[in-house]
């Protein structure tokens, strides 16, 4: 179960689901933040909107962390979810397309510590060179 969750948050190929993702996330945010006291709910909702907009340095950093965490967790489980789901390097790189833009240092660290070792041991499928 946990490894399936790691797969879903790290590089799910569900293209159909992505089409409705923003709407589903908005509905979930409205529901969840609506459960909180009004002032607290508004503050957290505004932070979520800031995160989604990716305009501030803080939002960009939060996005980098959001993208790196699944790689760290997959690496910590010896690539279990990547192996179970036959994850390709291209899926991971697509999920992290803005990570390098926002922090080349952290993306390079992720390549060295999480991606390359799992490519080397076959836990991530290397895409064919075209």
Residue positions per predicted region:
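Alpha-helical, largely C-terminal catalytic domains
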Residues: 1-130
